[in-house]
Amino acid sequence: MENIMNNPVIGVVMCRNRLKGHATQTLQEKYLNAIIHAGGLPIALPHALAEPSLLEQLLPKLDGIYLPGSPSNVQPHLYGENGDEPDADPGRDLLSMALINAALERRIPIFAICRGLQELVVATGGSLHRKLCEQPELLEHREDPELPVEQQYAPSHEVQVEEGGLLSALLPECSNFWVNSLHGQEAKVVSPRLRVEARSPDGLVEAVSVINHPFALGVQWHPEWNSSEYALSRILFEGFITACQHHIAEKQRL
């Protein structure tokens, strides 16, 4: 049996929560299981690791960085807007932005999902639509909280893959496919540092990658949901882990 301790070490950013009145940081099982099934070893990254001296010690130990989805939203002031964000998680913002900047500099692979994509957009100088529901010309991209979870994560709309990017290289035989949709915010302005990898039928950005980086991919949908059952989701996670293995080999050559 393969020794999981030999697998690429994937740092997973945690999310703020409360448990019986205590400040807590959590991760949902589906995000962790998707990494394990793809051949990675996930480790939880608490927000205190944003402290620069700790982050500097942490980064050489990571072979990849994984930014999962979350009920929280990125604070508006980080992309130049005013107003409060009732569902903010400042600790996650601080750690995610620091990790993204460090990973881009050190060429550490990144896989970002939902909120993670939005963090990638903001960290590279872009901005977000804060309330998609106020734009009637758009599809409904939020989940229905009254439905069972299995139905909330069911395919909701198609995405069209842009040619010539990372996503089309991972999925060369699949230029469009159906995805789930569980988000109320979205990329608004995308930095020139990013390539738009896919769009929904209403034109919204559904995937981005960082130009001139070996693997820094963000997707707006949730491929972690039952990832081992869907070939397209498996390909994305396995592509991420393969990139992490290449990063290990590159570190060993230096």
Where would I find each of the regions flagged by the language model?
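N-terminal beta1-alpha1 cap of cysteine-dependent amidohydrolase-like domains
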Residues: 1-111, 121-129, 133-171, 178, ...
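Conserved G/P- and acidic residue-centered "switch" motifs that form tight phosphate/ATP-binding loops
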Residues: 114
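Phosphate-recognition beta-domain surfaces
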Residues: 195
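Active-site-proximal beta-strand elements of phosphoester/diester hydrolases
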Residues: 217-220
